[in-house]
A protein has these predicted regions:
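Transmembrane helices of ABC transporter permease
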Residues: 31, 35-45, 159-210, 283-304, ...
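Membrane-integrated ABC transporters
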Residues: 1-50, 65-85, 100-104, 108, ...
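Juxtamembrane helix-loop junctions of ABC transporter transmembrane domains
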Residues: 11-18, 41-42, 49-62, 89-136, ...
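Helix-loop-helix
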Residues: 174-188, 262-341, 346-347, 370-415
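Short intracellular "coupling" helices and adjacent cytoplasmic loop segments at the cytosolic face
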Residues: 3-12, 109, 117-141, 145-147, ...
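An intracellular "coupling" helix at the cytosolic face of ABC transporter transmembrane type-1 domains
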Residues: 128-129, 145-154, 158, 162, ...
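ABC-type nucleotide-binding domain
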Residues: 363-671
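Transmembrane helix-loop-helix hairpins at lipid-water interfaces of multipass membrane proteins
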Residues: 36-99, 176-181, 290-306
Length: 671
């Protein structure tokens, strides 16, 4: 777990939402274009019904109600017909509103599903470097908080803003129809309101962006604290961790409080300004009507009637209220844009590059051990296949350009490789060679310095050294989790840079110190090593590494469901299942990254025999945690600050009484 100080000093990015975010959101939404069209039509019908109802008030009062006042025997039929028509308008508006809210559900959920699918698909293509440099809790926040804010915007904010704008435009046109002077007065008043609301929204928008960033940061800290709870308790870091969390939570509180304070002010301000406009219009309208001043509308010049005044007052509310609703929804949109920007930032991260062209294929091997025929079924023999036109000449020329011992190592690899007559097939034997390799996670700070070494097919190579010596880095480079800055890594005489990454990794079985099990049965977790493996092959792999007896003691044996990364199993049991997973993959080469470091001594004795069976005939790289596990290695390499300072067998290195001797006798601590 990262220390508290590094967490304390780390600040999330506080940039503004990307201006292209809205365009990208709508590119997803318009995948449902016909539903969107239907939603727009329903919103237009609703706005027209609302404006029509307000206009109808004028006719209802002036044409039907006022003429009946004072009559001894009024005719109610026309009034009832008018009220029925008005009711139909209201019903049309209600049905249209219900329809678009029903339609938006599919658009909303479908859009989010597509975004999550694309985000996860892109995430699967990201290099390991990305996950090593980003908190997992922050990545998870993209799928939870960020998508939830986007959901609210798609289902509520965007359609309601559009509906409000259409309603405001309809109300404006209706007011112009009735009275141009009164409409001008409303517009001037609205411009004043616009500047007030703009100031409020701009303040809230900045804080909503900060809020989303801090939510991701807090989530990342909580996840790391939960994963490291044992470490926190062992070192009595509860108070320090609590203090760091409180500081981050305080930042989130301040950003959220500011964002929501300014966001919640919008509607009260607009509402009260709307009441003020209503009162002013009523006073001015009454004065104009009593003075007998004619009014000017799109229909001509005529006196300001009671019906016209009531319609204008109603329309003014229908004009101001949508503006308030737009202002309020803008705060939600700002939050959604902040979340969407984070989502699209993840989706814009550069994917893992793979310029390799060499693939891994099944072959049938002739009796001479050199003749190869490519087949489409598993044979137990593999070969590297170059693309058409590549007979290996290019890699040979690259090897010839190397100097000194590196050139000698590379040329021997080429000579010893078993290749077909046309040069396109090279038998996979597990011959791995580093030539003048220099690498740093930060190019300016190399972790490995001009490393040259080789592993012959079937050899067991142990990498030992203190923490930070570069042991794990070597294995990261073999499977191309990272690419080297200088030098060359050869696999059966072929540069790993020229091999397609999926094929390269298929040839390597990896057992890590940190075990990851997935929700599912024990059988499913073993089969994860090779998805097309049968149940019998999975059981055979478990027997090979002496895991079968332990699994059969579980409640449902191989069908026991594991949850929460194998909670309920001991660390050693989880490690055993991961070793069986590597066994079922049946890889030509193995990387054991401190594979038995989490297993107690007694359990280690049980699994070691199985591990020996698994390693037979394979090139194996072992990152040593316990030196007792590497005594029978063919070659032991001692690394120190990125340099190979010693190499040889156990007995040879003990006799030298150098660094390995110091590690073995306990004079220097091994990690």
């Amino acid at each position: 777990m990262s220390n508290d100080q590094s967490f304390k000093n780390r600040k999330p990015d506080m940039g503004k939402a990307d201006p292209g975010t809205i365009k990208r959101i709508f590119s997803y939404i318009f995948q449902y274009k016909w539903r969107v069209v239907a939603i727009v039509v329903c919103i237009l019908i609703g706005a027209a019904a609302q404006a029509g109802s307000a206009l109808f008030l004028q006719s209802l009062i002036d044409t039907y109600i006022l003429p009946m006042v004072g009559e001894s025997n009024p005719d109610w039929a026309p009034l009832l017909r008018a009220i029925t028509l008005m009711g139909c308008l209201y019903v049309a508006g209600i049905v249209a509103s219900w329809a678009w809210q029903w339609l938006i559900v599919t658009v909303e959920q479908g859009t989010l599903k597509k975004i999550r699918d694309d985000m996860f698909a892109h995430q699967q293509k990201l290099p390991i470097r990305y996950f090593d440099s980003h908190e997992h809790g922050d990545i998870m926040s993209h799928y939870t908080n960020d998508t939830d804010t986007l959901r609210q915007a798609i289902s509520q904010s965007f359609p309601q803003m559009f509906s409000s704008i259409i309603s405001a435009v309809a109300a404006l046109l209706s007011m112009l129809w009735l009275s141009i002077p009164f409409t001008a007065f409303v517009i001037v008043f609205t411009v004043l309101l616009y500047f007030i609301v703009r100031k409020i929204v701009s303040r809230s928008g900045r804080y909503f962006v900060k809020q989303q960033q801090w939510i991701g940061d807090v989530n990342a800290f909580v996840e790391e604290s939960v994963n490291g709870q044992k470490v926190i308790k062992v070192f009595n870091h509860e108070d320090a961790t609590q203090k760091t969390f409180d500081e981050k939570n305080e930042e989130l509180f301040e950003a959220s409080a500011e964002a929501n304070t300014w966001g919640n002010v919008t509607m009260p301000v607009v509402g009260n300004m709307g009441y003020l406009l209503y009162i002013l219009l009523a006073i001015v309208g009454a004065a104009v009507s009593l003075a007998g001043v004619n009014d000017i509308g799109l229909t001509g010049v005529k006196p300001l009637t009671l019906g016209t005044l009531v319609s204008l007052l109603t329309l003014s509310r229908s004009f101001i209220n949508p503006i308030g609703q737009v202002s309020q929804q803008l705060t939600m949109v700002m939050m959604a844009l902040a979340g969407a920007s984070r989502i699209f930032k993840l989706m814009d991260e550069p994917i893992e590059e793979d310029k390799g062209t060499v693939t891994l294929v099944n072959v049938e091997l002739g009796e001479d051990g050199r003749t190869m025929t490519e087949v489409d079924h598993e044979t137990g023999h593999w070969a590297w296949k170059r693309e058409v036109g590549d007979d290996g000449t290019r890699s040979l020329k690259a090897a010839e350009k190397l100097k000194g011992s590196a050139r000698e190592v590379a040329m021997k690899a080429k000579e010893q490789a078993i290749t077909s007559p046309d040069g396109r097939l090279t038998l996979l034997r597990g011959d791995v060679r580093f030539t003048n390799v220099t690498f740093g996670y930060n190019p300016d700070k190399p972790v490995l310095h001009d490393i040259t070494w080789f592993a012959k097919p079937g050899q067991k190579i142990a990498l030992v050294g203190a923490t930070g010596a570069g042991k794990t880095t070597v294995t990261n480079l073999i499977n191309r989790f990272y690419d080297i800055q200088h030098g060359q890594i050869l696999y059966d005489g072929i540069s790993v840079a020229g091999i397609k990454k999926p094929d390269l990794r298929r040839s390597l079985g990896i057992v890590l110190q940190d075990v990851n099990l997935f929700t599912g049965t024990v059988m499913d977790n073993i089969r994860y090593g090779r998805l097309n493996a049968t149940d019998e092959e999975c059981i055979e792999a478990a027997r090979l590494v002496n895991v079968d007896s332990f699994i059969r003691m579980l409640p449902k044996g191989y069908n026991t469901v594991l949850e929460g990364d194998g909670s309920g199993l001991s660390q050693g049991q989880r490690q055993l299942i991961s070793i069986a997973r590597a066994a079922v993959a049946d890889p030509p080469a193995l990387i054991l990254d401190e594979a038995t470091s989490s297993i107690d001594t007694r359990t280690e004795e049980v699994v070691q025999a199985g591990m020996d069976n698994l390693m037979k005939g394979r090139t194996v790289f072992v990152i040593a945690h316990r030196l007792s596990t590497v005594r029978n290695s063919d070659v032991i390499m001692v690394l120190d600050h990125g340099n190979i300072i010693e190499r040889g067998s156990h007995d040879e290195l003990i006799a030298q009484k150098g660094e390995y001797y110091q590690l073995y006798t306990g004079a220097v601590e091994l990690e």
